[in-house]
Amino acid sequence: YINSRDDELGIFGRLRVPYNYSANTAACFMIKKDIYNKIGGLNETLEVAYNDIDFCIRVLKEGYYNVFLPQVKLIHYESKSRGLDTTSEKYKRFLEESKYMYDKWKDIIDNDPFYNPNFSKKGWFMLDKNKER
């Protein structure tokens, strides 16, 4: 959770317990070599954005889990080495990679098995007021 303090619990205590997610960031992940090879590694056509998400979804589709471990602390300076997507070329690449991901993984994006269906998809952890109960 971006900018969370060490003493925060997170929604439903998720910052304190191991939890499965459809995808985690590759800024810090570990996976057995044989599973990495079985999955086919990172999709190198996704140059910057989403290669980790694509990988994690393929891991999930093979029946494995992407587990967040709260006891691991990491500080990651997003875009520190490559810079921000502020040029028109970088932004165009980002849009193309976003489209690729949505086209390929629409089923997971629209029906994430680890996201509470009562939450809105338009904001973080907000109840969807338009959903029938």
Model-inferred region functions:
Residues 1-34, 38:
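A recurrent flexible, glycine/aromatic-enriched loop bordering the glycosyltransferase active site
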Residues 31, 54, 96:
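Short Gly/charged-rich anion-binding patches and loops
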Residues 8-13, 41, 116, 126:
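Glycine-centered flexibility motif
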Residues 60-132:
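Active-site-adjacent helix/loop segment of glycosyltransferases
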Residues 28, 56-57, 102:
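Generic hydrophobic alpha-helical scaffold/packing signal
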Residues 36-37, 44-47, 53-75:
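Catalytic donor-sugar/metal-binding loop of nucleotide-sugar-dependent glycosyltransferases
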Residues 18-26, 42-51, 87-90:
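Short, contiguous acidic/charged loop-to-helix segments that flank catalytic cores in large enzymes
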Residues 30-31, 37, 43-46, 91, ...:
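Generic secretory/membrane-interface signal
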